[in-house]
Regions:
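Conserved catalytic core of the tyrosine transesterase superfamily
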Residues: 1-230
Length: 230
């Protein structure tokens, strides 16, 4: 084989797209604003609008707080949720279970949705079965909100927030990891939270945190401090 001794070129690894903290805040502001009542809405329409707003806020808060894949978000069940402990058990790739952690804003958003939003959506079910769906997140007809529905809703929210075209639910997962590293989190802890089997998969996020690299460099290198400008 004349080509046997020739190594194939290695393609550069594509770096993930990441949102700035301010951009995530804009997205969250959009879902918060949707909770405000719209003057002139009839009661039924107002109830549905409010229920979907509670759901969307819980969706975004949960996705960002726990760094979930979209499939994990869609399949999350009530039985896997421990609000008091701030934990959500999810089934990741390879049928491997892990625990996603939820901060106070995410826990509050989920609690509000379960109390004010989900019951309204369940009332709109067209399924005659008495068995209620175990999934946490439901669509406007009280059925489980699937991956396609999640993507569609997320696209609409991102467009309204003025975020770049192409931002996806997975972008929030990338942002979750990068913001943790920027905040000083240990790489192996982030690996565990993301459910990555190999540390090398998580290390890609170290290449998209220039702010963190600059900070560590300035603190560690004896001649890294810049001269002050007159």
């Amino acid at each position: 084989d004349p080509w046997g001794g020739i190594a194939t070129p290695r393609l550069p690894r594509r770096l993930p797209r990441v949102l700035e903290v301010e951009q995530v805040a804009r997205l969250l502001a959009i879902v918060e604003a949707d909770l405000d009542p719209v003057p002139g809405d009839d009661p039924e329409r107002a109830a549905l609008r409010s229920a979907l707003a509670f759901r969307d806020r819980a969706l975004v808060e949960t996705a960002y707080a726990a760094g979930l894949r979209i499939s994990e978000l869609a399949s999350a069940t009530l039985g896997s949720l421990e609000i008091r402990r701030g934990e959500l058990r999810v089934m990741g790739k390879g049928r491997k279970e892990r625990v996603g952690l939820l901060g106070r804003p995410a826990c509050q958003a989920i609690a509000d949705y379960l109390a004010e939003g989900r019951p309204v959506l369940l009332e709109r079910r067209t399924d005659a079965s008495e068995v209620l769906p175990p999934e946490i997140f439901l669509n406007h007809l009280g059925a489980p909100l699937g991956v396609r529905g999640l993507r569609y809703r997320f696209d609409r929210l991102c467009a309204r927030a003025g975020l770049p075209v192409g931002v996806s639910p997975h972008t929030l997962r990338h942002s979750f990891a990068t913001h943790l590293l920027d905040g000083g989190a240990d790489l192996r802890v982030v690996q565990e939270l993301l459910g990555h089997e190999n540390l090398a998969t998580t290390q890609v996020y170290t290449h998209v945190s220039p702010g963190r690299l600059q900070s560590v460099y300035r603190e560690a290198h004896p001649r890294a401090r810049r001269l002050s400008t007159p």
